[in-house]
Amino acid sequence: MKKAVILISGGLDSTTCLAVAKSKGFACYALSFDYGQKHHSELVAAEKIAAHFNVVRYEVVTLSIGKLGGSALTDNSLDVPDYGGNESIPITYVPARNTIFLSIALGWAEILDAESILIGASAIDYSGYPDCRPEYIAAFQNLANLATKRGIEGHSIKIEAPLIHLSKAETIKLGYSLGVDYSMTVSCYRANEEGLACGYCDSCELRKKGFKEAEIKDPTQYITKV
């Protein structure tokens, strides 16, 4: 059976991505990162989601990039802001996060002799992060072609971003069609230890907008009524 490494955060997009990988018949190896994020409850969700999808193996890699600061998601001196609309690159951007994550996933994929890596990046209904764009995925694919044994032997590991051109509503509809239980997911940047959402950060607003446009009941549980 062909193998794939899937990056899962515990959120809506990455869970949909895992469902897509399962639907394609991949033997799924799920990978999460504890990088010092404040919303640690997403990792609790990720572990439950990996078990729910019966992945072959689930690993959590601990990184210390949070110590470097530079993002409201990791730096205690910076507050996670409410939804900022069309701000180009918000303070919740974690510098080079997807590059670091994909590099580690690439190494594991080589070890596993996996065919693909799947990431839930999207360039529509997103927070403006530069490492969630199609050109970024294409650039990392070039790196994978050049920097791996498989790549130079003509069997490059494919970097797949199946949600890259989907709106949040389209992503939710896709996941719903694949049987995803979104009540298991945690997307909020300010989620508490129980995984309850704030309802006001970028991620919460985009999630609410997605369910509304998809005309699917939002199962998100909030700290206070929003």
Swiss-Prot record:
It catalyses: 7-carboxy-7-deazaguanine + NH4(+) + ATP = 7-cyano-7-deazaguanine + ADP + phosphate + H2O + H(+). The keyword Coiled coil does not apply. Pathway: Purine metabolism; 7-cyano-7-deazaguanine biosynthesis. Zn(2+) binds at C188, C198, C201, C204. ATP binds at I8, S9, G10, G11, L12, D13, S14, T15, T16, C17, L18. GO terms for biological process: queuosine biosynthetic process. GO terms for molecular function: ATP binding; ligase activity, forming carbon-nitrogen bonds; zinc ion binding. SUPFAM superfamilies: Adenine nucleotide alpha hydrolases-like. Keywords: ATP-binding, Ligase, Metal-binding, Nucleotide-binding, Queuosine biosynthesis, Zinc. NCBIfam families: 7-cyano-7-deazaguanine synthase QueC. Belongs to the QueC family. PANTHER family: 7-CYANO-7-DEAZAGUANINE SYNTHASE (PTHR42914:SF1). HAMAP family: QueC. This is 7-cyano-7-deazaguanine synthase.
